[in-house]
């Protein structure tokens, strides 16, 4: 019954997104049943339509459980998406918590040849471990977030998970983008209410500011080509997810945005369309304002003049 309920929730989320029609949603399934950290029998009977599993904002702590999950995913052609965090270590060392679980999961990916996608990588140690895993032939991909490229722990005390890191970590991520180690940029969008944020909930909104932050930081300041940013935010994510998107070619979905690269704009959190406004970019001056969004050939958003 638990497995049936899990699949019903997945199907309902995707159905609701299709009804709204503003973006495509591909819902994942948990690695362990009900996030209990140990039960993985459901992985053997997942329908073929399930291509990704994740424990969301937790890491699977038990090594044997995670190893068995990787073995099953290799047989079932499923990609593991990992939030790397050793929950026993994170109360006293967030950095080590990310690094040590990144290393473990990369080794499991190499050993079982299981596709692994590392989410919101934030430390030098983690990105270097991923680089080494790729060099050894592990089928690993990874992403970084706009906020981990923009802020340092000296400039922002906003609570997110993984935390905002040091300037050295930020530079390591940018260097990894430049060298091709980073496959994608993703937002880790978390629209928590003001009440939840006051209670200490980790996360921030990031979808609407993502392109402007990355274009300003990577292209305007670091001199990286726009084509690379487009690859990181569109083409490569679509490839990782197996979607016919990210290219303006016959056979691909007509999903794209129109942006103004030349006119600076100031982020106003009160004008965001998200259900919450927990945005640390409020007041930042950016380039790359999104003027219009087209999905499936239909205009779904147009900025005010």
Language model segments and positions:
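A glycine-rich helix N-cap at a beta->alpha junction
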Residues: 13-31
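Conserved phosphate-binding/catalytic loop of the ribokinase/pfkB sugar-kinase fold
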Residues: 33-38
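Short glycine/proline- and charge-enriched loop/turn segments
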Residues: 154-160, 195-200, 272-277
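C-terminal cap of metal-dependent C-N hydrolases
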Residues: 253-305
